[in-house]
Design a protein with these regions (language model features):
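Charge-rich, low-complexity segments
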Residues: 1-180, 188-191
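Long beta-strand-rich cores associated with HINT superfamily self-processing modules
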Residues: 188-190, 194-197, 201-285
Length: 285
């Protein structure tokens, strides 16, 4: 795990929202998958490094660098072995930040870099899940590490005066898990993702985008969002963006079809009140 760093006290502004941040927020709200993306939209190496930091990679740590390089080489080998996928030498030899920047560029190298990163994402995820089963580490220990990270970052947000009016965190008790399984059509315990949950209430709906962007910088990376598990019945992504001058200019540059959002998503939990308004998403950490 990377060293504990003090989160930035600068709160993201809608007036300076970057395209990469808007893409990430959109992904969270609709429960999309980065595998469906065609490109990244990082404008600087610092942005690229920020994604790595959110995944607990420390580029000053030789072990982390070795781990990243191993994942990259495994991804390239997979593509060559199964698809005879040509990877130019400059792409194959690029460090991880350069690879992320290539995926944000244009041309054949962009396509290659993006494809490699998608496979790296899958390999890293699968190997992490395997490691979780192999190591003598209990869920409680993992939960404790996640809680420490979340409480530390949200603590900085609260002390810095960010527009959060309420924060609640905790682990679901067994009764809550029983009820959730009873309410689900697919009542298998392995499909309960959100055993550790946090609730953040912002001052207004205008604060949702900046708060999500900040959390994705410091708590969880956008590519860890579980596809199909998001629910958003607070705001319409498109209408919200169209109502804000700067965000409106970014809309034509989004990479997924414009009509993919829904104004509201049905909630499969029959125990939830129809008046309950929430942006709900699940992250696999």
């Amino acid at each position: 795990m990377s060293p504990v760093l003090e989160p930035a006290r600068e709160y993201p502004s809608l007036d300076t929202f970057r395209l990469s941040e808007l893409e990430a927020v959109r992904l969270v709200l609709r429960g999309g998958s980065v595998i469906d993306w065609h490109r990244l939209n990082f404008e600087s190496r610092e942005e690229a490094y920020g994604l790595l930091r959110a995944q607990e990679f420390d580029l000053s740590d030789s072990d982390d660098l070795e781990r990243i390089e191993k994942i990259k080489q495994d991804a390239i080998a997979y593509l060559r072995r199964n698809f005879d996928f040509p990877v130019p030498k400059p792409v194959a030899n690029a460090d991880i930040c350069d690879l992320l920047m290539m995926a944000s560029g244009r041309g054949h190298r962009q396509l290659c870099a993006c494809t490699i990163l998608k496979v790296m994402h899958i390999i890293h995820h699968l190997e992490a899940r395997e490691l979780l089963f192999m190591l003598p580490t209990s869920d409680q220990e993992v939960f404790h590490m996640v809680e420490q990270k979340v409480y530390r970052v949200v603590g900085w947000m609260l002390s810095s005066g960010f527009p959060i009016v309420e924060f609640i965190g905790g682990r679901k008790n067994k009764d809550s898990l029983y009820t959730k399984l009873l309410a689900k059509q697919k009542n298998i315990a392995a499909q309960i993702y959100d055993k550790l949950r946090f609730r953040v209430i912002t001052r207004s709906s205008d604060d949702i985008f900046p708060t999500l962007a900040y959390l994705m910088r410091h708590v969880f990376p956008f590519n860890y969002v579980i596809p199909g598990e998001s629910k958003n019945n607070i705001l319409s992504f498109r209408r919200f963006c169209e109502s804000h001058e700067h965000l409106r200019t970014l809309l034509p540059r989004l990479q997924i079809a414009e009509d993919i959002e829904r104004d509201s998503m049905p909630d499969d939990n029959t125990f939830t009140s129809g008046n309950y308004r929430v942006v709900h998403f699940v992250v696999d950490m």
